[in-house]
């Protein structure tokens, strides 16, 4: 967990002016950062499937589609009248960055460069 927190902390100041907006931890919390969630400011994260550089760096979209669009789930979804705009936003813009202990300084640097952050 210490390595994950250290790696997550390295992203914060260096991605401020990038194409990503990091999801902030709640006040008074100390997350373990299994992965660092970030919002793509423009574009669609599903396009990352074709971005071999992003995939090689461990950058992945979080949610491929809305739950009510998954096979067998539509009939189990109750409130479908509003189209789930918040969930749709997540499927289009939320991605995660790796924070595990095998992420080295060069990996962090490459992720920051990929995101257009400050090296």
Residue ranges and their predicted role:
Residues 1-119:
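PLP-dependent aminotransferase class I/II
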């Amino acid at each position: 967990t210490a390595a994950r927190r250290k790696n997550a902390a390295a992203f914060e100041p260096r991605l401020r002016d990038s194409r990503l907006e990091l999801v902030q931890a709640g006040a008074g919390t100390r997350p373990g950062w299994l992965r660092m969630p970030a919002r793509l400011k423009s574009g669609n994260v599903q396009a990352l499937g074709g971005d071999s550089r992003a995939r090689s760096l461990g950058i992945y979209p979080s949610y491929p589609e809305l739950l009510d669009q998954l096979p067998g789930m539509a009939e189990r979804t109750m409130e479908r009248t509003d189209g789930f705009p918040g969930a749709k936003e997540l499927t289009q813009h939320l991605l995660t960055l790796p924070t595990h202990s095998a992420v080295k300084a060069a990996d962090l640097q490459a992720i920051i460069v990929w995101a257009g952050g400050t090296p």
